[in-house]
Amino acid sequence: MTKSNLYRQYQKTAKIPYQLYNRRPGTDYGWLEVVTGNMFSGKSEHLIMSYFDILQADRFYVRSAQREGIDVIPRNVKAYKHSADKRYAESSIIAHSGMSIPCTAVDSVDRLVLDILTEDIHVALIDEVQFFQEKSESGQYAIVEAALHLLADKRFIIMAGLDKDFRGLPFGPIADLLAIADAKPYYVSTCAVCGAPATLPQRLIDGKPARYDDPVVLVGAAESYEPRCRSCHQILTDEDSYINKMEDLKAL
């Protein structure tokens, strides 16, 4: 008997779970991936491809375990998004490329966590996470506290959202989520004005840059936002004049 066969026989005899030598996030340990970047950069595509990759990986995992004579089950995988995102379909995450997956829309962190726990979801994919802006009694973003609790419960969480608002400032809970994330994929789009790498969302109202003091949350697609680089990004001030942060820095 070869060494590998001896090891397999030992595992079967000792009844060591298959997960101990091929561990999965969501059942054996917690893992948080926070996908960020600009508008139209591919964040939702990343989330959608992750959804299909996880389902395929689990099919392979279960077949491999069964060949070893060990019974394991695939992880429960489910996608969510904030109900504030009404751009395409309420029950789907749809990327700008047209790719889509089914999802459940929720309007609060409490409803999100309740659904994950009630349905025993091992892998939760959450789009537009920047809209979960409610805070707990401790003053912390509720989505951050929820993520920590879910990670302690060995859940696999993949979140996607804008890292900056239309002013170029950290968007809601994203900065705190990035601080606790185990993986941080970042995506850059192309400036709609000059074609340079774009890291800022430009909000447009009737074709003109938005005011600095406008509400942070305004859900839209191409008609209200476009990706821009730092040189082309503009904001309207109270004096009805446009400001560009890069130009302001050069003047210092």
Outline where the language-model segments fall.
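Short basic (Lys/Arg) and small-residue
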Residues: A181
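Conserved P-loop
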Residues: T2-D115, D165-D176, Y186-S189, A210-R211, ...
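Short recognition patches in nucleic-acid-associated and regulatory proteins
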Residues: T190-L218
